[in-house]
Amino acid sequence: MKKLLILLLLPLAGCAASGPERYVDPLVGTEVWQGGIAIAGHEEASGYTFPAVTEPFGMTAWTPHTQASKEPGTLHHRVPYWYSHEYITGFIGTHYPSGAVMFDYGAVELMPVSGTLRVRPEERSSSFRHQTERPTPARYEVTLADYGIDVRRAASKSAAAFEFTYPECDSAFVVVDAMPSLFTAGAPASITVSPERREISGKSAQTARAYRETGYFVVRFDRDFADYGTFNQNMDYPEVIENRYLFTEQEGKMVNGLRGVYTHRSPWQGDIRSERIDPVIDFDWDWYRPADDIDVKDYQVTWSGQLLAPESGEYLLGLQADDGARLWLDGELLIDDWGPHGYSMTPVQRAVTLEAGRMYDLRVEYYQQEWSSRVKLSWVRHEEGARRLLLRGNDRLESSTKCGAYVRFETEAGEPLRAWVGTSFISEEQARANLEREIGRNGVDRVAGATSELWNELLSTIELPGADEVQKSVFYTALYHAFLLPRSLSEDGRYRSPFDGEIHPGESFTDYSLWDTFRALHPLLTLLRPELSSRLVTGLLNAYDEGGWMPKWPNPGYTNCMMGTHGDAVIADAYVKGVRGFDTQKAAEAMLKNANVKGNHIAWGRLGIEDYNRLGYVPVDHYRESVARTMEFAYDDWCLARYFEALGDTLRSREYDERSLRYRNVLDPETRLVRARRSDGEWSSPSDYDISVWSGFNEQGVLNYRKNYTLFAPHDIPGVVDFLGGDRAAEAFLDDLFDNGIYYVGDEFSMHAPYIYNFCGMPWKTQRRVYDIVNTYYLPSPSGLPGNDDCGQLSAWYLFSAMGFYPMCPGSPEYQLGVPCLPEVVLHLPNGRDFRIVCENFGPGRCYVRQVTLNGRRLTRPVIRHEDLLAGGELRFTVGDTPATDCYEARL
């Protein structure tokens, strides 16, 4: 009711945003960054953001859903909005985690069309011009050029208000798609049209790698329906080609199935192979071996045999794969999807005419390169879809995998049609309650005004006196991205847990990109919103209660994404910085389980923990990415040490301090780089591709990753400097990283690298590197993010670095000092105090610090503590355009 009261008191707002919200450009990060990448050529340097309209940490974000063309099969991009796409298929209420290469779930989409009714995404889509877009955090406007329809939209936490202004016509339609996401196809859905209530309601679900999470929705209109119906695209969603239609020769006779030949692709692994008859091609090996003699990474499968068509007619043959796949029929290459990419629930399809009773030679090739491995061969009778698509006058569809509804209205020119949408993960009734509570029947302007107030309140936490328009745009856009996630799942004081499927009282969050966000995003929230930080920790502990483990990367439930258990770091960092209000004993229990108990699934705990505790490292012949696991487990152990130290548990603190040095067991003194070890203690080949699934599987990529991962011991940087050969050798190592394009700010494991110069006695080099990255890599344009934003982490790195300090080692109350890239910054802290950062003599190229004072006292080391910030006061940097080797008297 509080939100609704705010709405009623607000004056009608115009389109222009006010306050710091007016500097936010939600299109930043929606296009590929133009700077290129050296560390791994196939990584896509895109922000993977989208123009999200929602409240801070909102449950449902609304964005245009775009595609590259109107051709079938082109709606394949993981992120819902891509700046270079030319068509909008609808306006989606999404739960895709901004900036991350992960999954959407429980989405719903609205699309206004006029003239001929079109419901398929590629057919209903409309071209648009970016000049007609008006995006802000609270609202979005655009003109659909093909229909002449103006769209205005605003949103709250879990609801949205729309206005569609059509040309004068008697065929103004709104299409409601219950399964619009690439990652929801194939899951059960339903939709109901209720003319008497002027509503369409339903549910959609998700079957990607996370726990299935059903999304419920209610769409309400401001007038009666002139006509309505449902549509069903089940028949366009393919089925696995059954065993009875597949044949191969075995011992001189034909048997059902296809012959699969499994081989390694990497030259260093040799031509190890396995052969078998597979009944169908429908595999989800995830991170496991596809065959006994085949490793879990970098392999290829070739299936061969014959295909029998049961009936004559046109079929759509389809392939879905993670990573690449291609298909030949009678020697002709029909599908060529040969490239590294994630698994899409929408297959790559090609039409082919088949004759009943005829056998066709079939060959399918598949390769796995990175992350999980999945592949599916499917087909569907193409002409059946057209016959059964539209069900006019039908008011309900249940248990459909691809369904939706449409309504028709009669409109006058210039008269807006209004619609409101409520969403929920609990029930349809809760979606309706969320709609009533948050926005009622208020229009776009009032809803946008209320959401703008929330954004301005949060963005105003940091003030930028003296900054120019470009600096404010980059900064406040980064702050907007930092305040989108984690996603609140709480609805009226309760939530449905994605970890056990039950409804619980209290509060929950999801889409914590913990491998990324423990580094800067969570420390930023701990500084600016410690009460929220406490709630986020409680959310992790609720997940522990409900599923038995703290998640590593919930989306919305457990996933096997990344290596360490960095919820440990989030909890330790929050606690040592004074955050309270969560169950400290439960946190200790959950962290100890991570550090000592082997999970019975790769999504739980630390994969390889039993070997890590037995050998002191994770062996390469047992687990992928063994070096990264060893390095990350050691850092997480250090975080446990700091947590138990703060609790007063000296014995445990000492134990985990000792464990935290195990990262040294994978430091190779011969190459002075990290290096994988086998379970017998011997070193693996220096060119072992195991270092990272993102290494590009070539020697240069492997070397680049080894160099970057060598630096990941943020808790023991003096030890890393010693390993590299001392100050001068470490300086040369870092110079090589930066000068030769080996360092990449868009990947997290070495984000702290610019600050390592501080530990070599060369803080002026930290200042120069940070200044260059901040001012070169972050821009106010769609291509203005140099990598995946990863739920705000890339933005948080910028925010700290632009302000002049950085949490190099979460779990420690210390921040490393760089150089401010803004003339002045004022932090309005939650305790009522202000902390001011002043850059004296600020100007272009003046990136070298002469001296730093804290409340008038000169600092002798490039460090400031968390309690110094909370006390309020002034941090003053005096800068110039030449290095000052005496800017600090003492070294770290």
Regions from the PLM with identified roles:
Residues M1-L4, I717:
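Positively charged n-region of N-terminal signal peptides that target proteins for export
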Residues L4-A13:
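Sec-dependent N-terminal signal peptides
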Residues A17-Y245, Q250-K253, R396-A569, Y575-M631, ...:
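Accessory carbohydrate-recognition regions in carbohydrate-active enzymes
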Residues Y140, A172-V174, G313-Y315, D323-A325, ...:
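Short beta-strand/loop motifs in extracellular/secreted proteins, especially
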Residues L144-D146, E249, R265-P267, W379-H382, ...:
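Short acidic, glycine-rich loop/turn motifs
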Residues I241-L316, Q320-D395:
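Extracellular/secretory pathway-exposed regions associated with glycan biology
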Residues W328-G331, P830, L854-R857:
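Short strand-turn-strand beta-turns centered on an Asx-Gly dipeptide
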Residues D636:
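ATP-dependent phospho-/nucleotidyl transfer catalytic cores
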